[in-house]
């Protein structure tokens, strides 16, 4: 609730900002709660979920993000273009107030974690498992950002769509993200978060190879836009649950760290994916880099699983 208050208040400042500098600062401040909100939200969703459905609960929470991308972004653009950018922010403030009221009315009271302070939670990052999961997220899912960072020129230069078609095609990616997010939660509950992440990253690698070789065929390209969006967001709930299950006693801060790891992956994917373009290769080439990043994530998950087994075995010996 506190994070939503911050989000709503700072967006209100944006709506009434008298100068560009004020608007810039207000936008910066309104973005601060983002990672913490989804980190805390993931933990809360997993705690209030039915037994065996924690990952599905997390995926439902993130489904709001995917739906917002499909509906909110074009709606905000439409309002800003036809009316005023200030009204766009006013709508965001209204949605924030509705969300606050909803949280107050329907979010159940959860018992706070006892005997934990910030120092104790930060100690989780002394563990190798924490950094392995962050690396899995940053490198493995950096493959997604190799694709999405250069999707517009891929669609226009390789698939030969017009630039006017691109915004509508991206709706397909958004729809795929909604579907994939839901499927990923079910898979993580059925199997395990670690195994699910492996399956998704392997599928992502194959998908990006297909994007590289087949995007010149328009019908196939459209299909791959949907599939790539679905595959990429199928990973969100499993990787969150992998971190939550590993960071016992430090779930909140560890879950928020995943959001930072995704942002690192965003930067890495855009940078590494751009290198072949600088070297003169086609706009399909970033997807081969993305394939390599996805496969590197698979290797890191296997390393995590083996290391985790050793830790659990050692803990079992110490308690006997």
Where are the language model's segments positioned?
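Structural signature of the two symmetry-related core transmembrane helices
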Residues: 1-12, 195-209
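Paired small-residue
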Residues: 6, 10-13, 21-30, 219-227
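Helix-breaking motifs and short loop linkers at transmembrane-helix boundaries and internal kinks
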Residues: 16-22, 160, 214-215
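Cytoplasmic helix-loop-helix junction between adjacent transmembrane helices
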Residues: 20, 26-64
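A membrane-interface helix-boundary motif in multi-pass transporters
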Residues: 78-93, 275-294
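C-terminal membrane-cytosol helix-exit motif in multi-pass small-molecule transporters
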Residues: 93-112, 300-305
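Helix-to-loop junctions at the C-terminal end of transmembrane segments
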Residues: 180-192, 277-278
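A late C-terminal transmembrane helix in Major Facilitator Superfamily
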Residues: 245-283, 290
């Amino acid at each position: 609730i506190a994070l939503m208050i911050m989000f709503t208040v700072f967006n209100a400042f944006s709506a009434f900002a008298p100068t560009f500098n004020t608007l810039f600062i207000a936008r910066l401040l309104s973005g601060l709660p983002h990672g913490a909100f989804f980190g805390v939200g993931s933990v809360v969703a997993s705690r209030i979920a039915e037994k065996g459905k924690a990952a599905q609960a997390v995926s439902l929470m993130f489904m709001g993000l995917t739906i917002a991308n499909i509906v909110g972004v074009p709606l905000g653009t439409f309002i800003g273009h036809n009316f005023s950018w200030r009204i766009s922010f006013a709508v965001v403030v209204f949605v924030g107030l509705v969300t606050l009221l909803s949280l107050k009315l329907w979010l159940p009271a959860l018992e706070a974690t006892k005997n934990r302070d910030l120092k104790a939670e930060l100690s989780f990052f002394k563990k190798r498992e924490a950094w392995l999961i962050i690396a899995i997220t940053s490198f493995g899912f950096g493959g997604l950002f190799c694709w999405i960072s250069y999707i517009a020129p891929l669609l226009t230069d390789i698939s030969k769509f017009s630039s006017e078609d691109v915004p509508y095609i991206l709706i397909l990616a958004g729809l795929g993200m909604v579907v994939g997010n839901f499927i990923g939660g079910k898979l993580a509950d059925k199997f395990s978060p670690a195994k699910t992440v492996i399956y998704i990253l392997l599928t992502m690698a194959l998908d990006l190879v297909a994007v590289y070789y087949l995007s010149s065929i328009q019908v196939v390209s459209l299909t791959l836009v949907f599939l790539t969006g679905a595959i990429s967001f199928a990973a969100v709930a499993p990787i969150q649950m992998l971190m939550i299950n590993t960071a016992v006693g430090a779930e909140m801060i560890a879950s928020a760290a995943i959001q930072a790891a995704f942002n690192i992956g965003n930067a890495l994917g855009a940078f590494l994916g751009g290198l072949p373009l600088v070297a003169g290769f086609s706009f399909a080439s970033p997807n081969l880099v993305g394939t390599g990043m996805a496969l590197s994530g698979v290797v890191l998950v296997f390393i995590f699983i083996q290391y985790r087994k050793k830790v659990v075995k050692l803990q079992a010996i110490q308690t006997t």
